[in-house]
Amino acid sequence: MLAARIAGPGAGRDNGRVHVAVIGAGVTGLVAARELLRKGHEVEVLERWPDVAGQASAFDLGNGVHLDRYYHHLFESDRHMIDLHEELLPGQLEWFRSSVGMYARGRIWPFTTPRDLLSYSPLPLVDRLRLGIAVTRLTRRNDWERMDDIPAAEWLRRECGARAYDGVWLPLLLGKFGDDAQNVPLAWLWSKLTLRRKLEGRSAGRELLGYPRGSFRAICVALADDIRAQGGRIQVDREVLAIERDQDRWRLRVAGPGAYRAPAGTGPADPDLTRAVDAVVITAPTDAARDLAPWPDAFRMRLAEWTYRTAVVLLLELRRQYSGTYWVNVGESDVPFLGLVEHTNLVPAERYPARYLYVSNYVAADDPLTQLSTDALLAHYVRQLGVIAPDFREADVMRAWSFREAAAQPVPKLGNRARILPFATPLPRIYLANTTQIYPEDRGTNYSVRLGQQVAQAVGQTPA
């Protein structure tokens, strides 16, 4: 057992209870903390931001109505998150019929069902058929490991044809991955099309998406409440600056309140907040984890292999409906954003004070869009928003917010399986769990739940 291998104050207690610090109060960190408490460990969670939930965070629109900063939903195959809701928030997860569209040639085309594909006239019929056959063949495969070295772009161009590739896939790949689009493995696309969107039971032949009452933050608040009820501690507005050796334990240097307002890692450490622990679970992104601990050079280089795309999201509060579609992919390369998600076309608008539209983009970390103010971002997008929906007027915008997440999308590359890091790091009793480790699956709250469960299981199973 882990405790038997740990020396120093507070370790090796009679019942195997050890002091574990979890860095990050997003879904993965909270689930890991809860599971570790169930194993009988002493657990505290340290979060840089002044609230729990991480990338599942929300904000108050007024009168206690919360809305996600970044759009989320669940598929019926997302059993980890569904089961968690059934346990902690029974009856709060609801299912709604979805609609997907593709913007091309000046209009939004339905793009939800096979029938929609057959009616998608921006492509000649032969290309529609070819695209449908290729996707069907791909989703019936179960050998994703063999796809790890195959470029998705190359396969799509060959199997779907140049017109379907240029008109459907290329804008999506470029919008998602930019300069890395040509090196994204086919395994990633296979997972996107097969695992996350597997339809079960009542959703066969249509698409139902799940959304919890009160936003996705609600499940994080429920997790936090359960952690505290079990005796765990959650410290928000506490940024961990460094993990240092302290004989056979680990000492965490922690910044004081307000450090989140400064760039990560730059706040001064507060000596009163320094603490020694037996084990550490890091749920921060890989680029942030790279500078946290005294890693061996070879491991630090493996951490440095990972890059992320930054999410830039403009959220608009509208007087009236923008379009009749929940999720609109953009199939035109000259449009300055990747997609549109009209939340109130999924969840009934009556639950909110207005209509809400997310304008989504994924960009490189140094892209100028990451530096634009909310007003400047709206000004950059507003003309194209009117082109896509001709009835839209800038006067329809009542309020606007913008959000940026630097570690929104890990970038998979050819041969990505070899880049996946185990939960146990080379440093004894330090563990890593983040979205770079869920490949071939794409990032999502469901896989964050699974990650938290898996890393908690790994704690204590590896030699010190």
Q: Where in this protein do the model-derived segments appear?
A:
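Internal hydrophobic alpha-helix adjacent to the cofactor/substrate pocket in enzyme cavities
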Residues: 449-464
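Short FAD-binding loop at a beta-strand-to-alpha-helix junction that anchors the flavin cofactor
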Residues: 357-358, 423-441, 447, 451
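Mid-domain catalytic core of redox enzymes
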Residues: 39, 238-371, 375-392, 403, ...
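Active-site/ligand-binding neighborhood in enzyme catalytic cores
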Residues: 131-242, 246-249, 258, 276
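Glycine-rich FAD pyrophosphate-binding loop
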Residues: 37-62
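N-terminal Rossmann-like FAD-binding beta1-loop-alpha1 element of flavoenzymes
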Residues: 18-45
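Dinucleotide-binding Rossmann-like beta1-alpha1 core, especially the glycine-rich loop
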Residues: 63-144
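Extreme N-terminal leader/targeting segments of oxidoreductases
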Residues: 1-20, 38-39
